[in-house]
Design a protein with these regions (language model features):
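N-terminal intrinsically disordered/low-complexity leader segments
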Residues: 1-5
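Helix-turn-helix
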Residues: 6-9, 13-51, 55
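Solvent-exposed, amphipathic alpha-helical segments
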Residues: 9, 13-21, 67-71, 100, ...
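Hydrophobic alpha-helical connector segments
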Residues: 55, 66-99, 144
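Amphipathic alpha-helical packing segments from all-alpha helical-bundle domains
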Residues: 65, 92-98, 108-134, 138-142
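Acidic, metal/ion-handling microdomains and their immediate structural contexts
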Residues: 104-105
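Hydrophobic/aromatic-rich alpha-helical bundle segments in the mid-to-C-terminal region
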Residues: 111-115, 130-177
Length: 177
């Protein structure tokens, strides 16, 4: 008897395929092959591919944006929040972030989700910089965020890249008290 797959099993399988093979691998046939189940299980959980893709995007937005922000905001001051957010962001699955962004170049729905996520992340960073007393919080947030996105694209990541990026951002902050 086949093992039943949960909705989360399907999401996990899709994220793994997306990370390894790109969005073109997100087909019902490829997913059922990956999970070794019938298409009926897929349709039971999602109804169609569009609903499945929406579930993937929702999971990604929650795990890669809402959860790191939630974790950071458990801290009681802006400096600690910034440090906690930095740790949470460093621990993200960056190849998956790249795969979602590449998908967004080809799919308008994904692009809309990315625009929303980018806005949420920028607002979070702007708030952190404002709370730390920086005079140009929007500019600093934009610089920090675009450096984060760009740094993910350098392949392979040079040794010490995360540290170098952090040092550059710290230097910038010193000039914007």
């Amino acid at each position: 008897m086949a093992v039943r797959k949960s909705r989360q099993d399907w999401v996990d399988a899709g994220m793994e395929l997306l990370r390894r093979e790109g969005q073109q691998s997100l087909t019902i046939e490829r997913l059922t092959q990956q999970l070794q189940v019938t298409k009926g299980s897929f349709y039971h959980h999602f109804g169609n591919l569009a609903n499945y893709q929406q579930a993937l995007l929702q999971w990604w937005e929650d795990a890669f944006t809402h959860e790191p922000i939630r974790i950071a905001w458990q801290e009681d001051n802006a400096q600690k929040r910034a440090q906690r957010l930095g740790r949470a962001v460093r621990d993200l699955d960056h190849p998956l972030e790249i795969a979602v962004r590449a998908w967004g170049l080809r799919d308008p729905e994904v692009a809309r989700t990315l625009a929303s996520v980018d806005q949420q992340r920028l607002e979070c960073l702007t708030g952190l910089h404002r709370d730390q007393g920086h005079q140009q919080p929007e500019l600093l947030a934009y610089l920090e965020y675009t450096a984060f996105i760009g740094a993910q694209l350098v392949q392979p990541a040079p040794d010490g890249a995360a540290r170098a990026l952090q040092q550059a951002l710290d230097l910038w902050r010193e000039h914007d008290p």
